[in-house]
């Protein structure tokens, strides 16, 4: 099912949590990396974002997180035009979004436990209230025995699983994940997928950028497919 700059999928236009309308994006004076992107995601939906390297997946996620700015078109987040959001208000909105970056962005001076708990601490949570939940989550991603370790002593796969745990610990309104299973084995990949599905069942809107075709096929979730910076598919896996 294809989309264009003026058409939105019928099942996503009811109070979308995220909406792109004719969006283009470029870095500096370079050619556009995103071209005429239009779609809308309803609250509580689950989508994969697919496409070859360089198709624009990471750039699209950066727009949603307000790490980059569109060169044209309109991006709405929680019903608000991102370009109209005051800089002082952006940190609050970002706290409603859980993000798994490819580069992890862990704090080296904190333990795995404290890295995972950081969003709860920033939100004003008390350690006595969240200690058990954080420990349980770290156990779920296979880091129970490593919760007191510093990031420098973790493997690439362990760092990735820690970054995922940190992104979901606060049950965000939106979860954005950029290649979240790229450094883990199939067993952990399926466990991570189940974690995302459970979070989605609790109401979080999930958007996962991935090259993992097996993960997409196993999930049965709808796909946003990018080719050359254009949105070429909206629908179930394998339907164009």
Place the predicted regions along the sequence by residue.
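Short coil-to-helix segment of the ABC ATPase nucleotide-binding domain corresponding to the Q-loop/switch region
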Residues: 110-118
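Catalytic Walker B motif of ABC-type/P-loop ATPase nucleotide-binding domains
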Residues: 175-178
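Helix-to-loop junction immediately C-terminal to a conserved catalytic motif
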Residues: 65
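Conserved ABC transporter NBD signature motif
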Residues: 73-81
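Conserved signature/switch motifs of ABC ATPase nucleotide-binding domains
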Residues: 149, 170, 202
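Conserved ABC ATPase signature
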Residues: 150-154, 158
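ABC ATPase NBD coupling module
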Residues: 28, 82-98, 199-201
